[in-house]
From Swiss-Prot:
InterPro entries assigned to the protein according to its UniProt record, in alphabetical order: Ribo_uL30_ferredoxin-like_sf, Ribosomal_uL30, Ribosomal_uL30_CS, Ribosomal_uL30_euk, Ribosomal_uL30_euk_arc, Ribosomal_uL30_ferredoxin-like, Ribosomal_uL30_N_euk
Ribonucleoprotein keyword on record: yes
Lineage: Eukaryota, Fungi, Dikarya, Ascomycota, Saccharomycotina
One Pfam family of this chain: Ribosomal_L30_N
Gene Ontology MF terms: RNA binding; structural constituent of ribosome
GO (cellular component) term, any one: cytosolic large ribosomal subunit
Protein name, entry field: Large ribosomal subunit protein uL30
Amino acid sequence: MADKILTPESQLKKSKAQQKSAEQVAAERAARKAANKEKRAAILERNAAYHKEYETAERAVIQAKREAKANGSYYVESQPKLVFVIRIKGINKIAPKPRKVLQLLRLNQINSGVFVKVTKATTELLRLVEPYVAYGYPSYSTIRQLVYKRGYGKINKQRIALSENSIVEANLGKYGIISVDDLIHEIITVGPHFKQANNFLWPFKLSNPSGGWGVPRKFKHFIQGGAFGNREEFINKLVKSMN
């Protein structure tokens, strides 16, 4: 009878290690899958809460306007906390000071746009560059469409499309911002981490307005029939034509 062939001890150890490694990989894969599922559920729950928050705020304004009208008074909206600023003029004939302000606002190219928190300081900056920019108060819809259609993040000085929530989480997760909709919420509410969220966003590259600027003289103030300056809620119409 032939001698029984024994598997060397080293071979047995290697086989057991490989089996353990395969089991560990499978366990880790299952754990990641469960964590991702939980994360997706949390994101959906947050998004639903955001949607409800936006709807509630909108209904409150409508109701307040109705009550004011019924009482024969006028509803005064709260001071806006956010503006969207678009550079509409190139580099020719710009004095050094406003040129520096445009750089500070990250508006280095014509048709580039950025969100700016309204403060006393930023209001002064906008006044200095008013002949070179159009700005106003963006709606939720405008902000959402901008981020989803033209949103890019600044990652290691590179311009990266916000194609996945994981890109946002990897860069802003430490601030509790783990999805594109979290990012939008932080911008629209001018939240506690607005600065970090806004700096993460690469300045938006917009197109020329579809159908042109629609004004006889572009470089006159908006209230005089031109294009530059504060156009308040009318900024939404302009962005829509450039997005």
